[in-house]
Amino acid sequence: MIVALMGCAVGPSFEEYLTTVKSAGGTNAQDCGVGRRSESDKIALACASDALAQNRSFIAVFERRGIDSQVFASVVGNERGELWRISWDSDVTGGAGGNPWPKRRIFRTVCERAWSDAIAKCINS
């Protein structure tokens, strides 16, 4: 008997990624929503920029254009003015479906708040 396992991904799921983002923002973080490369990007960006200017905790999630995988980048800020980019890649191996075990990964980076367009630069860093 031969048993084949195909399509088993390794690493954190998208749901686990969202849990990580929400946890980083804290219980009182304003949820600015998910921007999906459209008008919702502008709404989430405006919400996050407003929260940052008022030193409020927030989370904003943005879908990015991946070459061969699904990619999301979140900006998370807290009351102390700290700012992070937390991103998720559905397959860091660049397998484009060729790898039977895609490797999902979460990355966390500190962003500079000094920029006037800190949120946009953080998302695209």
Regions found by a protein language model. Name each.
Residues 1-6:
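Sec-dependent bacterial lipoprotein signal peptides
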Residues 9-10:
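Bacterial signal peptide processing site
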Residues 13, 36-38, 52, 116-117, ...:
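Mature cores of small secreted peptide/protein domains
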Residues 13-34, 94-96, 122-124:
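Acidic (Asp/Glu-rich) sequence patches and key acidic residues
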Residues 20-61:
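N-terminal secretory signal peptides
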Residues 59-65, 87:
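Short beta-strand segments that buttress and anchor functional surface loops
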Residues 69-125:
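Polybasic, proline/glycine-rich intrinsically disordered low-complexity segments
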